[in-house]
Protein backbone atom coordinates (compact mmCIF):
# COMPACT_ATOMS: atom_id res chain seq x y z
CA UNK A 1 0.00 0.00 0.00
CA UNK A 2 1.56 3.27 -1.11
CA UNK A 3 1.64 6.30 1.16
CA UNK A 4 3.30 9.70 1.42
CA UNK A 5 5.34 11.16 4.24
CA UNK A 6 7.05 14.52 4.31
CA UNK A 7 8.99 16.73 6.67
CA UNK A 8 10.21 20.27 7.06
CA UNK A 9 13.71 18.97 6.28
CA UNK A 10 14.67 15.94 4.20
CA UNK A 11 18.21 14.54 4.09
CA UNK A 12 18.63 12.63 0.83
CA UNK A 13 22.03 11.23 1.90
CA UNK A 14 23.10 11.13 -1.73
CA UNK A 15 26.64 11.84 -2.90
CA UNK A 16 26.05 15.61 -2.62
CA UNK A 17 24.47 15.18 0.83
CA UNK A 18 21.53 17.36 -0.23
CA UNK A 19 19.14 18.89 2.29
CA UNK A 20 15.66 19.76 0.97
CA UNK A 21 12.90 21.77 2.63
CA UNK A 22 9.24 20.70 2.79
CA UNK A 23 9.83 17.64 0.64
CA UNK A 24 8.13 14.27 0.71
CA UNK A 25 8.44 10.65 -0.34
CA UNK A 26 5.93 8.34 -2.01
CA UNK A 27 6.70 4.74 -1.10
CA UNK A 28 5.52 1.20 -0.66
CA UNK A 29 8.19 -1.45 -0.11
CA UNK A 30 10.48 0.75 -2.20
CA UNK A 31 10.68 4.49 -2.75
CA UNK A 32 8.47 5.44 -5.70
CA UNK A 33 8.96 9.19 -6.01
CA UNK A 34 10.53 12.17 -4.24
CA UNK A 35 9.27 15.73 -4.57
CA UNK A 36 7.75 18.79 -3.00
CA UNK A 37 5.30 17.49 -0.40
CA UNK A 38 2.32 19.60 -1.50
CA UNK A 39 2.89 18.67 -5.14
CA UNK A 40 2.98 14.97 -4.25
CA UNK A 41 -0.31 15.18 -2.33
CA UNK A 42 -1.95 16.87 -5.33
CA UNK A 43 -0.53 14.27 -7.71
CA UNK A 44 -1.60 11.35 -5.48
CA UNK A 45 -4.79 12.61 -3.73
CA UNK A 46 -5.95 9.06 -2.95
CA UNK A 47 -2.88 8.16 -0.86
CA UNK A 48 -2.58 8.44 2.90
CA UNK A 49 -0.29 11.40 3.59
CA UNK A 50 1.41 12.73 6.71
CA UNK A 51 3.67 15.76 7.13
CA UNK A 52 6.02 16.12 10.10
CA UNK A 53 6.61 19.74 11.18
CA UNK A 54 9.94 20.68 12.78
CA UNK A 55 11.23 17.26 11.81
CA UNK A 56 13.92 15.57 9.76
CA UNK A 57 13.15 12.75 7.34
CA UNK A 58 16.16 10.68 6.30
CA UNK A 59 17.15 7.11 5.42
CA UNK A 60 17.28 4.63 8.28
CA UNK A 61 20.84 4.30 9.56
CA UNK A 62 23.19 1.41 8.82
CA UNK A 63 25.40 0.23 11.71
CA UNK A 64 27.89 -1.75 9.65
CA UNK A 65 29.96 -3.27 12.46
CA UNK A 66 28.77 -4.41 15.87
CA UNK A 67 29.16 -7.41 18.21
CA UNK A 68 25.81 -8.25 19.79
CA UNK A 69 27.33 -11.23 21.62
CA UNK A 70 29.09 -8.88 24.07
CA UNK A 71 25.92 -6.97 24.99
CA UNK A 72 26.11 -8.20 28.60
CA UNK A 73 29.32 -6.29 29.28
CA UNK A 74 29.43 -3.31 31.60
CA UNK A 75 32.85 -3.11 33.28
CA UNK A 76 34.42 -6.55 32.86
CA UNK A 77 37.02 -5.39 30.34
CA UNK A 78 39.98 -3.06 30.85
CA UNK A 79 40.27 0.19 28.89
CA UNK A 80 43.17 2.55 28.30
CA UNK A 81 45.27 0.27 26.11
CA UNK A 82 44.62 -2.33 23.45
CA UNK A 83 46.87 -4.86 25.18
CA UNK A 84 45.12 -4.50 28.53
CA UNK A 85 41.72 -4.76 26.88
CA UNK A 86 42.57 -7.88 24.83
CA UNK A 87 43.97 -9.64 27.88
CA UNK A 88 40.82 -8.89 29.86
CA UNK A 89 38.60 -10.14 27.01
CA UNK A 90 40.45 -13.46 26.97
CA UNK A 91 40.21 -13.73 30.76
CA UNK A 92 36.59 -12.60 31.20
CA UNK A 93 34.89 -12.96 27.82
CA UNK A 94 33.38 -16.38 28.52
CA UNK A 95 31.34 -15.10 31.45
CA UNK A 96 29.96 -12.23 29.36
CA UNK A 97 28.48 -14.69 26.86
CA UNK A 98 26.43 -16.47 29.53
CA UNK A 99 22.71 -15.62 29.73
CA UNK A 100 23.09 -12.82 27.20
CA UNK A 101 19.79 -13.20 25.31
CA UNK A 102 18.04 -10.43 27.23
CA UNK A 103 20.97 -8.08 26.77
CA UNK A 104 21.04 -8.80 23.04
CA UNK A 105 17.31 -8.08 22.81
CA UNK A 106 17.91 -4.74 24.53
CA UNK A 107 20.76 -4.01 22.12
CA UNK A 108 18.50 -4.68 19.14
CA UNK A 109 15.89 -2.36 20.65
CA UNK A 110 18.56 0.34 21.04
CA UNK A 111 19.42 0.01 17.35
CA UNK A 112 15.83 0.58 16.30
CA UNK A 113 15.21 3.47 18.70
CA UNK A 114 18.31 5.26 17.41
CA UNK A 115 17.02 5.00 13.84
CA UNK A 116 19.07 2.02 12.69
CA UNK A 117 17.41 -0.24 10.13
CA UNK A 118 20.35 -2.42 9.07
CA UNK A 119 23.29 -3.96 10.93
CA UNK A 120 26.50 -5.78 10.19
CA UNK A 121 26.71 -8.24 13.09
CA UNK A 122 30.00 -10.01 13.83
CA UNK A 123 29.27 -13.40 15.39
CA UNK A 124 31.38 -16.22 16.78
CA UNK A 125 28.61 -18.35 18.25
CA UNK A 126 25.45 -17.27 16.33
CA UNK A 127 23.75 -16.53 19.66
CA UNK A 128 22.01 -13.47 18.22
CA UNK A 129 20.79 -14.89 14.92
CA UNK A 130 17.29 -15.98 15.93
CA UNK A 131 16.72 -12.72 17.78
CA UNK A 132 17.77 -10.80 14.67
CA UNK A 133 15.44 -12.90 12.52
CA UNK A 134 12.55 -12.09 14.85
CA UNK A 135 13.34 -8.36 14.82
CA UNK A 136 12.51 -5.86 12.06
CA UNK A 137 16.22 -5.20 11.41
CA UNK A 138 17.96 -6.06 8.16
CA UNK A 139 21.04 -8.00 9.20
CA UNK A 140 24.23 -9.15 7.53
CA UNK A 141 25.69 -11.69 9.96
CA UNK A 142 29.45 -12.18 9.62
CA UNK A 143 30.47 -15.58 11.03
CA UNK A 144 33.95 -14.88 12.39
CA UNK A 145 36.94 -17.22 12.25
CA UNK A 146 39.80 -17.22 14.76
CA UNK A 147 42.71 -19.65 14.80
CA UNK A 148 46.44 -18.91 15.00
CA UNK A 149 47.51 -22.41 13.94
CA UNK A 150 46.36 -24.68 11.14
CA UNK A 151 43.58 -27.13 12.01
CA UNK A 152 41.59 -28.94 9.34
CA UNK A 153 39.13 -30.11 11.99
CA UNK A 154 38.46 -26.54 13.11
CA UNK A 155 38.04 -25.41 9.53
CA UNK A 156 35.51 -28.16 8.78
CA UNK A 157 33.52 -27.27 11.91
CA UNK A 158 33.52 -23.63 10.83
CA UNK A 159 32.30 -24.53 7.35
CA UNK A 160 29.47 -26.58 8.88
CA UNK A 161 28.47 -23.65 11.10
CA UNK A 162 28.49 -21.35 8.07
CA UNK A 163 26.15 -23.76 6.28
CA UNK A 164 23.79 -23.52 9.27
CA UNK A 165 23.87 -19.75 8.96
CA UNK A 166 23.29 -19.88 5.19
CA UNK A 167 20.25 -22.07 5.77
CA UNK A 168 18.75 -19.30 7.93
CA UNK A 169 18.99 -16.67 5.19
CA UNK A 170 15.81 -14.89 4.20
CA UNK A 171 14.75 -11.57 2.73
CA UNK A 172 16.25 -9.55 5.57
CA UNK A 173 19.06 -11.76 6.92
CA UNK A 174 22.18 -12.54 4.89
CA UNK A 175 25.16 -14.72 5.79
CA UNK A 176 28.71 -13.40 5.50
CA UNK A 177 32.20 -14.28 6.74
CA UNK A 178 34.86 -12.60 8.86
CA UNK A 179 38.59 -13.20 9.26
CA UNK A 180 39.21 -11.86 12.75
CA UNK A 181 42.58 -10.09 12.47
CA UNK A 182 46.19 -10.47 11.26
CA UNK A 183 47.37 -11.49 14.72
CA UNK A 184 44.75 -14.20 15.26
CA UNK A 185 44.24 -16.15 12.00
CA UNK A 186 46.88 -18.37 10.40
CA UNK A 187 47.37 -17.60 6.73
CA UNK A 188 46.23 -20.92 5.22
CA UNK A 189 43.14 -20.82 7.42
CA UNK A 190 42.44 -17.24 6.35
CA UNK A 191 42.83 -18.18 2.69
CA UNK A 192 40.35 -21.03 3.17
CA UNK A 193 37.76 -18.68 4.72
CA UNK A 194 38.30 -16.16 1.92
CA UNK A 195 37.86 -18.90 -0.68
CA UNK A 196 34.65 -19.96 1.07
CA UNK A 197 33.44 -16.37 0.74
CA UNK A 198 34.27 -16.33 -2.96
CA UNK A 199 32.56 -19.68 -3.56
CA UNK A 200 29.41 -18.57 -1.71
CA UNK A 201 29.53 -14.99 -3.05
CA UNK A 202 29.58 -13.68 0.51
CA UNK A 203 30.85 -10.43 1.96
CA UNK A 204 33.95 -10.42 4.16
CA UNK A 205 35.00 -8.39 7.17
CA UNK A 206 38.27 -8.13 9.08
CA UNK A 207 39.70 -6.07 11.93
CA UNK A 208 42.85 -4.38 10.63
CA UNK A 209 45.69 -2.48 12.32
CA UNK A 210 43.63 -1.41 15.29
CA UNK A 211 46.62 -0.86 17.57
CA UNK A 212 50.31 -0.05 17.65
CA UNK A 213 50.89 -3.49 19.19
CA UNK A 214 49.32 -5.13 16.14
CA UNK A 215 51.34 -3.00 13.72
CA UNK A 216 54.63 -3.83 15.47
CA UNK A 217 53.79 -7.52 15.43
CA UNK A 218 52.59 -7.77 11.84
CA UNK A 219 55.52 -5.79 10.44
CA UNK A 220 58.37 -6.87 12.73
CA UNK A 221 57.24 -9.85 14.89
CA UNK A 222 58.13 -7.74 17.94
CA UNK A 223 56.44 -6.10 20.88
CA UNK A 224 53.61 -7.03 23.21
CA UNK A 225 52.32 -9.91 21.08
CA UNK A 226 55.51 -11.92 21.76
CA UNK A 227 54.40 -12.28 25.38
CA UNK A 228 50.76 -12.65 24.32
CA UNK A 229 51.40 -15.89 22.44
CA UNK A 230 53.55 -17.28 25.25
CA UNK A 231 51.14 -16.35 28.04
CA UNK A 232 47.75 -17.07 26.45
CA UNK A 233 48.55 -19.67 23.79
CA UNK A 234 51.60 -21.29 25.44
CA UNK A 235 53.59 -20.92 22.21
CA UNK A 236 57.19 -19.70 22.35
CA UNK A 237 59.32 -18.34 19.49
CA UNK A 238 56.13 -17.42 17.66
CA UNK A 239 56.45 -15.18 14.61
CA UNK A 240 53.94 -12.98 12.82
CA UNK A 241 51.52 -15.00 10.71
CA UNK A 242 52.13 -12.64 7.76
CA UNK A 243 55.07 -10.97 6.01
CA UNK A 244 53.77 -7.53 6.80
CA UNK A 245 50.51 -5.66 6.27
CA UNK A 246 50.65 -5.93 2.48
CA UNK A 247 50.81 -9.73 2.69
CA UNK A 248 47.57 -9.66 4.68
CA UNK A 249 45.84 -7.18 2.37
CA UNK A 250 46.72 -9.12 -0.76
CA UNK A 251 44.74 -12.17 0.39
CA UNK A 252 41.51 -10.17 -0.08
CA UNK A 253 42.02 -9.52 -3.78
CA UNK A 254 38.81 -10.02 -5.82
CA UNK A 255 36.58 -9.81 -2.73
CA UNK A 256 34.07 -7.43 -1.15
CA UNK A 257 35.67 -6.70 2.23
CA UNK A 258 35.03 -4.37 5.15
CA UNK A 259 38.31 -3.33 6.82
CA UNK A 260 37.47 -2.28 10.38
CA UNK A 261 39.40 0.30 12.47
CA UNK A 262 42.59 0.94 10.39
CA UNK A 263 43.97 3.74 12.60
CA UNK A 264 47.53 2.42 12.29
CA UNK A 265 47.36 1.74 8.55
CA UNK A 266 49.82 3.83 6.55
CA UNK A 267 48.81 5.72 3.43
CA UNK A 268 50.66 3.04 1.46
CA UNK A 269 48.59 0.29 3.12
CA UNK A 270 45.32 2.14 2.47
CA UNK A 271 46.25 2.70 -1.17
CA UNK A 272 47.06 -1.00 -1.45
CA UNK A 273 43.62 -1.86 -0.06
CA UNK A 274 42.10 0.43 -2.68
CA UNK A 275 44.12 -1.04 -5.56
CA UNK A 276 44.15 -4.73 -4.61
CA UNK A 277 40.70 -5.36 -3.10
CA UNK A 278 37.88 -5.38 -5.65
CA UNK A 279 35.31 -3.77 -3.33
CA UNK A 280 36.97 -2.31 -0.23
CA UNK A 281 35.25 -0.33 2.52
CA UNK A 282 36.60 1.19 5.72
CA UNK A 283 34.66 1.13 8.99
CA UNK A 284 35.58 3.36 11.92
CA UNK A 285 34.35 2.97 15.51
CA UNK A 286 35.51 6.17 17.24
CA UNK A 287 34.35 5.41 20.78
CA UNK A 288 36.00 1.99 20.76
CA UNK A 289 39.17 3.41 19.24
CA UNK A 290 39.40 6.03 22.00
CA UNK A 291 38.98 3.45 24.76
CA UNK A 292 41.51 0.99 23.36
CA UNK A 293 44.28 2.68 21.39
CA UNK A 294 43.48 6.35 21.91
CA UNK A 295 44.00 7.04 18.22
CA UNK A 296 41.42 8.06 15.63
CA UNK A 297 41.30 7.12 11.96
CA UNK A 298 43.15 9.66 9.77
CA UNK A 299 40.37 10.99 7.52
CA UNK A 300 42.76 12.96 5.31
CA UNK A 301 44.68 9.75 4.69
CA UNK A 302 41.56 7.78 3.79
CA UNK A 303 40.46 10.56 1.44
CA UNK A 304 43.85 10.55 -0.30
CA UNK A 305 43.58 6.77 -0.68
CA UNK A 306 40.14 7.16 -2.28
CA UNK A 307 38.32 5.04 0.32
CA UNK A 308 34.91 5.81 1.82
CA UNK A 309 34.39 5.55 5.58
CA UNK A 310 31.39 4.18 7.47
CA UNK A 311 30.77 4.92 11.15
CA UNK A 312 29.76 2.03 13.42
CA UNK A 313 29.38 1.32 17.13
CA UNK A 314 31.46 -1.86 17.51
CA UNK A 315 30.12 -3.85 20.50
CA UNK A 316 29.63 -3.19 24.19
CA UNK A 317 32.96 -4.94 24.67
CA UNK A 318 34.48 -1.55 23.84
CA UNK A 319 31.65 0.96 24.12
CA UNK A 320 29.11 2.21 26.64
CA UNK A 321 26.28 2.67 24.13
CA UNK A 322 25.04 0.95 20.99
CA UNK A 323 23.12 4.05 19.91
CA UNK A 324 24.53 5.03 16.53
CA UNK A 325 23.53 8.62 17.35
CA UNK A 326 25.90 8.57 20.32
CA UNK A 327 28.60 7.15 18.06
CA UNK A 328 28.12 9.89 15.48
CA UNK A 329 28.53 12.50 18.20
CA UNK A 330 31.73 10.76 19.32
CA UNK A 331 32.90 10.93 15.70
CA UNK A 332 32.29 14.70 15.65
CA UNK A 333 34.38 15.16 18.79
CA UNK A 334 37.20 12.84 17.72
CA UNK A 335 38.29 14.47 14.47
CA UNK A 336 39.86 17.88 14.02
CA UNK A 337 38.25 19.39 10.94
CA UNK A 338 35.55 22.00 10.25
CA UNK A 339 32.36 20.80 11.92
CA UNK A 340 29.95 21.34 9.03
CA UNK A 341 32.19 19.31 6.73
CA UNK A 342 32.67 16.62 9.37
CA UNK A 343 28.91 16.40 9.99
CA UNK A 344 28.33 15.49 6.34
CA UNK A 345 31.02 12.79 6.51
CA UNK A 346 29.36 11.41 9.66
CA UNK A 347 25.87 11.38 8.14
CA UNK A 348 26.97 9.65 4.93
CA UNK A 349 29.06 7.26 7.03
CA UNK A 350 25.90 6.09 8.78
CA UNK A 351 23.74 5.91 5.65
CA UNK A 352 25.02 5.83 2.06
CA UNK A 353 28.47 4.42 2.77
CA UNK A 354 27.19 1.87 5.26
CA UNK A 355 24.69 0.59 2.69
CA UNK A 356 27.42 0.20 0.08
CA UNK A 357 29.66 -1.58 2.59
CA UNK A 358 26.91 -4.12 3.38
CA UNK A 359 25.78 -4.29 -0.29
CA UNK A 360 22.25 -3.17 0.62
CA UNK A 361 19.78 -1.29 -1.56
CA UNK A 362 19.08 1.44 1.00
CA UNK A 363 20.91 4.26 2.75
CA UNK A 364 19.66 6.99 0.38
CA UNK A 365 16.33 8.60 -0.41
CA UNK A 366 16.14 7.79 -4.09
CA UNK A 367 13.59 6.13 -6.36
CA UNK A 368 13.80 2.30 -6.34
CA UNK A 369 15.78 2.20 -3.09
CA UNK A 370 14.26 0.11 -0.30
CA UNK A 371 11.93 2.27 1.78
CA UNK A 372 13.97 2.26 4.98
CA UNK A 373 13.08 5.69 6.34
CA UNK A 374 13.18 7.47 9.68
CA UNK A 375 11.68 10.65 11.09
CA UNK A 376 13.10 12.57 14.05
CA UNK A 377 11.04 15.31 15.65
CA UNK A 378 12.45 18.47 17.26
CA UNK A 379 11.03 21.48 19.11
CA UNK A 380 12.23 23.91 16.48
CA UNK A 381 13.17 23.99 12.82
CA UNK A 382 16.86 23.99 11.94
CA UNK A 383 18.28 26.27 9.29
CA UNK A 384 19.19 24.45 6.10
CA UNK A 385 22.89 25.32 6.45
CA UNK A 386 23.13 24.03 10.04
CA UNK A 387 20.61 21.21 9.70
CA UNK A 388 22.91 18.17 9.51
CA UNK A 389 25.13 19.30 12.38
CA UNK A 390 22.21 20.32 14.60
CA UNK A 391 20.46 17.03 13.85
CA UNK A 392 23.52 15.02 14.88
CA UNK A 393 23.94 17.06 18.05
CA UNK A 394 20.32 16.91 19.21
CA UNK A 395 18.73 13.70 17.88
CA UNK A 396 18.03 11.21 20.66
CA UNK A 397 15.30 8.79 19.59
CA UNK A 398 13.42 8.17 16.36
CA UNK A 399 9.78 9.32 16.13
CA UNK A 400 8.87 6.82 13.45
CA UNK A 401 10.80 4.18 11.52
CA UNK A 402 9.76 2.46 8.30
CA UNK A 403 11.63 -0.65 7.14
CA UNK A 404 10.72 -2.04 3.75
CA UNK A 405 7.80 0.39 3.79
CA UNK A 406 6.35 -1.03 7.02
CA UNK A 407 6.17 1.17 10.08
CA UNK A 408 8.01 -0.60 12.93
CA UNK A 409 8.12 2.36 15.36
Swiss-Prot record:
Disulfide bonds: none annotated. Gene3D superfamilies: Metal-dependent hydrolases, Urease, subunit C, domain 1. Zn(2+) binds at residues 65, 67, 207, 314. Signal peptide: none annotated. SUPFAM superfamilies: Composite domain of metallo-dependent hydrolases, Metallo-dependent hydrolases. Its EC number is 3.5.4.4. It is an enzyme of class 3 (hydrolase). Binds 1 zinc ion per subunit. GO terms for molecular function: adenosine deaminase activity; metal ion binding. Belongs to the metallo-dependent hydrolases superfamily. This is Adenosine deaminase. The lineage of its organism: Bacteria, Pseudomonadati, Campylobacterota, Epsilonproteobacteria, Campylobacterales.
Amino acid sequence: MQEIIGASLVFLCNEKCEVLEDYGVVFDEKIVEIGDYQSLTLKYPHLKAQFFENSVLLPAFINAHTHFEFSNNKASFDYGSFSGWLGSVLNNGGAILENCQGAIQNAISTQLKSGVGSVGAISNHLIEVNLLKESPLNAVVFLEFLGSSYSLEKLKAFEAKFKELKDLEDKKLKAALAVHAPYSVQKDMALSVIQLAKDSQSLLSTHFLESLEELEWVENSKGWFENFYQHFLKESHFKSLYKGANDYIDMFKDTHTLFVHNQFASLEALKRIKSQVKNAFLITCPFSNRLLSGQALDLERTKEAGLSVSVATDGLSSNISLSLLDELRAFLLTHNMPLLELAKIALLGATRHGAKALALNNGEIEANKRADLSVFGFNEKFTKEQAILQFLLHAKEVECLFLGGKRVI
